[in-house]
Amino acid sequence: MNASPQAKGRRAALHDLPRRWPLACALLLSLPLPAFADSVTDWSAFADEVIGSAGGPPQQFRVLAMTQIAVHDALNSIDRRYRTYSVVGPVNPNASPDAAVARAAADVLRATMPSQAATINAHYAAAIAALPGCPVAAPGCIDQGIAAGAASAAAILQERQGDGSATPHLPYTLAPGPGIYQPTPPTPPPPAPYPQFAGWANLVPFAIISRRQFMAPRAPELRLKSRAYADEYNEVKAVGSFAVRNAAPDSEESRVARYFPAGGANLNAIARAVVAGKSLDRWQHARLFALVNMAVTDALITTFHAKYTYTFWRPYTAIHWSDDGNPRTRPDPAWTSYLTTPPYPDYPCGLPTTMGAGAQVMRSYFGTNHLPYTLAAGGITRSYTRLSDAESDSVDARVYAGIHFRFGCEAGVVQSRKVGKWVYHTQLRPLPHW
């Protein structure tokens, strides 16, 4: 489809991330639990049901990465097909894989979200009770599986002790000025931390070497007097305002703006939808889910480091500012964004970061971008045939929501794809006999 009028004449579209107009076709909301083929996908879906208690999206993905690593390592302590993330010893090969998966996931979720203990305990008890009895040749298989899961969960929980997650937020003291991020309404009342996740750049990564390794470079659009910045400013001002979007709530632009923050960027739900019908086994599912969540977590570390390095303002602040020094921009003190602006700086964008990292892992895993899936979120169902189309829509969504400039969203995808490739090629690699 054709690019938006605002985009014409600007830099070339991001490779394999086409702009489309209109569109073709905090993050993890509760989604219906469909019946899946195995315990790994079942526990992944259950984790989505309780993960909101972990905190904001960066905190959620950290917990999900730990959970999926524990599941992966538990299975590979029973049958070693892939390198484990943590050091776990081998267990009886007759141990129940499903018991191991259940205990590994439940232990990490309980430890990281104690407020959900009752719900997790009930789900775990039901999962164990539903297991078939052990064969005569493998007495004690369920207890052995439980022990394997407990060991892998303990290993990753110990490894992530003191990883920096206890101090996600830091004081923010920059004074208002042209281009400088400032909190946007509605701000939470004290003592809620605002803005948020300045400390997330200090989180110990799961796989990348450092938070700077794939950090988005300084973009030309950060120069307020440039034509490039003016183009970005005028695009989001035109298409992301509450007045424009609310006047056409059922338009493609308005629907995609709502879809992604309502759960359309739930990479675990996307991964489960992608693998449906592919006849993967528990080991393959576990490896993919662990890689996706590690990549997203590490990409967000990189993103928040960049956000608080550049501290670039959000469209709301920019459009309200009386004089940014650019003759091609015109302030509007009455302008409001279609959706509420998240409480942290603009560049680069977080939601497209998650999409880019997770999608790249799946592309690398399956060796193709053509991975069709359908996912419902926020009362909207969308279908994609290529992962890059979903990434592209996630970029558009933040512009149509009025909460991001396009260049920051594209940068988020670019840097996170690099993270996804790194994670895939360095972590949980197949063992030689596989």
Q: Which role fits each region the language model picked out?
A:
Residues 11-12, 34, 38:
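Short linear motifs centered on Gly/Pro in flexible linkers and helix caps
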